[in-house]
Swiss-Prot record:
It catalyses: 2-C-methyl-D-erythritol 4-phosphate + NADP(+) = 1-deoxy-D-xylulose 5-phosphate + NADPH + H(+). PANTHER family: 1-DEOXY-D-XYLULOSE 5-PHOSPHATE REDUCTOISOMERASE, 1-DEOXY-D-XYLULOSE 5-PHOSPHATE REDUCTOISOMERASE, CHLOROPLASTIC. Mn(2+) binds at D150, E152, E221. It comes from the Bacteria. This is 1-deoxy-D-xylulose 5-phosphate reductoisomerase. Pathway: Isoprenoid biosynthesis; isopentenyl diphosphate biosynthesis via DXP pathway; isopentenyl diphosphate from 1-deoxy-D-xylulose 5-phosphate: step 1/6. GO terms for biological process: isopentenyl diphosphate biosynthetic process, methylerythritol 4-phosphate pathway involved in terpenoid biosynthetic process. Pfam families: DXP_redisom_C (PF08436), DXP_reductoisom (PF02670), DXPR_C (PF13288). Keywords: Isoprene biosynthesis, Manganese, Metal-binding, NADP, Oxidoreductase. NADPH binds at T10, G11, S12, I13, R37, N38, N124, E126, G205. It comes from Clostridium perfringens (strain SM101 / Type A).
């Protein structure tokens, strides 16, 4: 039996991970969880799975949960803040950590978990975006496996199995194109948060839904793929595939292209990461090839969806430039959702930050965290 912690248990990936655990009750024990504000769902999870440790990152919610746990006589330790997240990620008794928190907050607990020798099922792509060099070095030094939970990176990983890594010609990273595929810049001027949150294929949280609409999500995945698979940026090609059936592909030097196909359901890559290297039965719908009428592919429009272009530029420049890109994007998404900035201002402000801040510093935990704070403060003061 594998013992696991889930960081971000009440979010989209967290709750789908719980679905996998319910289906494989004999295979996993949930030891630790973290959440932010959703105390009602957290209480339901505590009652169902009986985790020993619960970390809450929101102060009022933490106090409320402490009282609820005590009043109902539940046996779990409730911990507050970043200290709590790190504790849940580094528990001696766990084997694997599912990092499904959104944003920079996942960096420190993930790095500390790696230093403790815990395998990582990584759904928090920002960790590799802002500190890929540091994270992959730590993983190698500590003998830790980093198993991608993103459907695209899971597909690439599966397509690499049994093949020589040095025979890769290119990675073909698929993208649905988001809800605004085919739009012009003029069309995007009137985009509202409500429209941007409606993704055509995937059910996701707010932040990743906006990122998917701007193609920043794909840009972050390009940087993530660079670090996970040690692949130059010039050999990572984004392919728009609206049906979201092919989750990504690897083209080899002999011309062969190996792909992983499946229904668009995050429980598939979650389960693959948790069970690796084994394959087990799944609660998800199986792919019916006879129901697929067509598989189409097109190039992304980098002039209209500038965030993807900016992500490639940040990745190529390296050092702390991806930290600037990520921090600026997180704040811009928040401001857009709160209707403080327009949709088209998102790439404009990100580019402004990339041209404003010094990125040419060593990638350390402190440097990443400090620069991230500077970028966020700059945007809040100017645009909030």
């Amino acid at each position: 039996m594998k013992r696991i912690s889930i960081l971000g248990v009440t979010g989209s990936i967290g709750t789908q991970t719980l679905d996998v655990l319910r289906f494989h009750k004999e295979d996993f024990e949930l030891v630790g969880i973290t959440a932010n504000r959703n105390i009602e769902l957290t209480m339901d999870i505590i009652k169902e799975f009986s985790p020993k440790y619960v970390a809450i990152n929101h102060e009022e919610s933490y106090k409320k949960l402490v009282d609820l746990v005590k009043s109902e006589g539940l046996k779990c330790e409730v911990i507050y803040g970043m200290e709590g997240l790190v504790k849940v990620a580094t528990l001696d008794e766990i084997d694997i950590v599912v990092t499904s928190v959104v944003g920079m907050i996942g960096l420190k607990p993930t790095v500390e978990a790696i230093r403790k020798g815990k395998n990582i099922a990584l759904a928090n792509k920002e960790t590799l975006v802002v500190a890929g060099e540091l994270v992959m070095r730590e993983a190698k030094e500590n003998g830790v496996k980093i198993l991608a939970v993103d459907s695209e990176h899971s597909a690439i990983f599966q397509s690499l199995q049994g093949n020589a890594h040095n025979k890769i010609d290119k990675i073909l990273l698929t993208a649905s194109g988001g809800p605004f595929r085919g739009f012009t810049i003029k069309d995007l001027k009137s985009v509202t948060p409500e429209r941007a949150l409606k993704h055509p294929k995937w059910n996701m949280g707010q932040k990743i839904s906006i990122d998917s609409s701007t193609l920043m999500n794909k840009g972050l995945e390009v940087i993530e793929a660079h670090w996970l698979f040690d692949c130059p940026y010039k050999d990572i090609e984004v392919v728009v595939h609206p049906q979201s059936i092919i989750h990504s592909m690897v083209q080899y030097t002999d011309g062969a292209v190996i792909a992983q196909l499946g229904v668009p359901d995050m429980k598939l890559p979650i389960q693959y990461a948790l069970n690796y290297p084994n394959r087990e039965g799944n609660i998800s719908e199986k792919l019916d090839l006879f129901k697929i009428r067509e598989l189409t592919f097109e190039k992304p429009d980098l002039d209209t969806f500038k965030c993807l272009k900016l992500a490639y530029e940040a990745g190529e420049k390296g050092k702390l430039m991806p930290t600037i890109l990520n921090g600026a994007n997180e704040v811009c998404v928040e401001l857009f959702l709160n209707k403080k900035i327009t949709y088209l201002q998102i790439p404009e402000i990100i580019e402004e930050c990339m041209n404003t801040f010094d990125y040419n510093k060593e990638v350390t935990l402190d440097n990443v965290i400090n620069l991230d704070k500077e970028v966020r403060q700059y945007i809040y003061e100017k645009y909030n």
